[in-house]
Amino acid sequence: MKELTVQELYDLNETIAGELFEGVTYPWEVLPKIGEFIVKLGNTLPEDEYEKKGENIWIAKSAKVAPSAYINGPAIIGKDAEIRHCAFIRGNALVGEGAVVGNSTELKNVVLFNKVQVPHYNYVGDSVLGFKSHMGAGSITSNVKSDKTLATVST
């Protein structure tokens, strides 16, 4: 399963969460660590670049957040990111630099690398999206199959 490793899938220079991936082989191994990591990292972010808004929410001063967007912590919104109308960030979300979280898009327990685009009616849960990933309108990532059976990965 070499092609499914963090080393093969991601450019860790394109996220402020590089440290989160240290010591793991597969991307899903970081999922239970995202919230704690965000709190740790958030408390070290430079105050001249990030503003703390509420409990465990850090938003880059250069980011654009629509007034109708909802952000629950822990969350970090990176530099030049755009959080659009009615976006719903449920927590444990790290949104990379220049990323777009679109209208009516929902995030939960995610790392979005720099310049990721989830622009239209997406659900991104328990996921890691790499540099410049783009999800088409209405796309869903989730850790639960509709029939509740385990997912099997084969190569």
Regions found by a protein language model. Give the residues of each.
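Flexible, glycine/small-residue-enriched loop-and-beta-strand segment within the central core
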Residues: 42, 69-155
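LRR N-terminal entry segment and analogous cap-like coil->beta motifs
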Residues: 64-68
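Periodic glycine anchor positions in long extracellular repeat architectures
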Residues: 60-63, 78
